[in-house]
Amino acid sequence: MGVHLVRHLEDCGDDVVQLERTVDGVDIVDAPEITEAVVAAKPTAVYHLAGAADVGGSWATPNETFLANALGTLNVLEACREAGAERVLAVTSADVYGRVTEDELPITEEQPLRPVSPYAASKVAADALAQQAWLGYGLPVVRVRAFNHLGPGQSDKFVAPSLAERIARNERDGGDEVPIGNMTPLRDVTDVRDVVRAYRLLVERGEPGDVYNVCSGRSVAVKEIADLLLDMAARPMRLVSDPALQRLVDIPVLVGDHGRLSRVTGWAPTIPLDQTLADVLADWRSRLAG
């Protein structure tokens, strides 16, 4: 996500200072360290995307997940106050909505939060901290609840990239099995390049203190994503159910309503799912060839 956001901001003519743990050694859990880095950057706007993103892994690492996503967000918000940032975009996750009933779909921002995983609970805390920073301190925070995003460069810890990685590996090595976990969940998937457009528009036009869903407004089954990728494979392959890839608890359906975002910014998703998946598969073919 960060690579795509930086590229989009630079394409729009913005001056970008990127703080990334693996590059700069800045840890958002270390309050003095993140404050020093943010203050030194003298930002007018801050995009906070950092944190733990492994939903399934959060069951085994709940403490680490909460520290990264809740304490990390608090530290970033405090650093932004210290730096005098004019706008902060705090990105959480649609997982905060948890289990919803059919009559609650598509999910609006008014939907009650029912976190299921430790990851989701940590994002609820981050969302609340961002709201408190606005209400309590007047920090101009715009909150985002991002549904599933997908695009080139994404980690194979996520479903679609992991499927694409295995297909590309099979094409190279001669295998024909593609392991997969639960195929029934319905997800709302948006191309990451559309998502970063939404983020910049929200920094420009979003209302401080408000929260916005970033989503496509359409649901797609994991099985459908897998079938689309298999259709793009260079030769026949088959899905194989792998219990090790099953999450402890899986939310059956997440599909959002981006009406508020569209009304405020004029944003709409533009890149179709089949194009996104083709780009993801091409990315993995390139990675494995290199």
Predicted ranges, named:
Residues V195, Y199, V214, I225, ...:
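Non-catalytic, hydrophobic alpha-helical segments
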Residues A60-E78, E82, R87, V96-R143, ...:
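Catalytic helix-loop patch of NAD(P)-dependent Rossmann-fold dehydrogenases
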Residues L273-G290:
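Amphipathic terminal alpha-helices
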Residues E10, V16-I34:
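Adenosine-cofactor binding site in Rossmann-like domains, unifying the SAM/SAH pocket
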Residues V100-L105, Q131-D188, V192-L201, S219, ...:
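NAD(P)-dependent short-chain dehydrogenase/reductase
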Residues V178, N182, V211-Y212, V220-D227, ...:
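C-terminal "lid/loop" region of Rossmann-like NAD(P)-dependent oxidoreductases
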Residues A31-A68:
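NAD(P)H-binding glycine-rich loop region in Rossmannoid oxidoreductase-like domains
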Residues G2-V3:
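N-terminal Rossmann-fold NAD(P) dinucleotide-binding loop
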